[in-house]
Amino acid sequence: MNWSVEWKAFLYVLAAFLGVYYLPVGQPRFDGAVTEALQLVRWYAREHVLLCLVPAFFIAGAISIFVSQASVMKYLGAGARKVTAYGVASVSGGILAVCSCTVLPLFAGIYRMGAGLGPATAFLYAGPAINVLAIILTARILGLQLGIARAVGAVVFSIVIGLLMHFFFRREEEERAAIQAQMPAGPEGRPLWQTVVYFAAMVLLLVFATWGKPEHVAGFWAAVYGMKWWLAGAAALALGLILVRWYGMKWYQLGLLLTVGINFGYAWGAQATFALLTLGLALALWKAGGELREWLDASWGFAKQIMPLLLAGVLVAGLMLGRPGHEGLIPSEWVARMVGGNGLGANFVAAISGAFMYFATLPEVPILQGLLGAGMGQGPALALL
């Protein structure tokens, strides 16, 4: 045995043993935190994986297969004008109702297609913060001032962070740009308007399938919520027709999917039907072969890479801070006590605390409403957003 090599493995095993040996099992705080972690990851799996992440993986896979690399390089590539690249990247998330987890596969998709690290990072940072629903809800509940500050701050800081990432990894980006410059231009793809319509159908399906229930039972948002599955179904039908007309899917495959959706929609409920239709679509893409099977393979690749990391992150967030309104290892009153006022310390604590919290898109607004009512300052609230 070579201890000069094996000592690290021994320390890892020893640390794991001591950690398990001294686990504070039976302590109310620890047991509650473990329960919160499991509750949060279960809620996440039920509320976000099927209706939110699965469509996002399909969109990311479609980006890597159907979006022309020349188009990505033109607007977001390392050789694009910085004003254009960062401008497009920082505001393009405005039309997507995505949370910080859903944006990850989209970020991976555009980066793999040749987008520069800086613009891709700007999109990753700004996307969850500036979608239209989040900005409108923030302005309505937390005030117009915070709504505008959130939108402007997300765009500005995304550009700053993107520029910093480009600076820190400039050598790698220069090498990547040199390799891309030597690559031959790809073949001409479909007309741009067809690609736009195709992605619009998928984005609308994602938006309507994840449309949350508003607080008020009347008004535009409530009306959309009442029709969400009809609207999502219309977007899914449009997507199916597009796949048949432009992408080579067979008519009988679309007919089978429609039959399943109509026959099982009322009996099984929306989510079960959505899951069954997703499996049916995956099977149809696999049977079709060609670029449709490549789309399925790319989507599965993103899911396999990202899902374990996301679930692990949600578990850690639940263990440390618990669900909203519940306790984790870190007492919530500590957070509330440390972020009162608008001082530098409160803003710093809010920013650090936010890094360990998981919020889906929109639920963070009522949570912050409660914190603001408890004395949280406007500055820390914006930092937490």
Tell what function each PLM region has.
Residues 41, 45-52, 58, 80-95, ...:
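Small-residue-enriched transmembrane helix starts and helix-helix packing motifs
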Residues 1-5, 139, 143-194:
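Juxtamembrane and boundary regions of transmembrane helices in multi-pass small-molecule transporters
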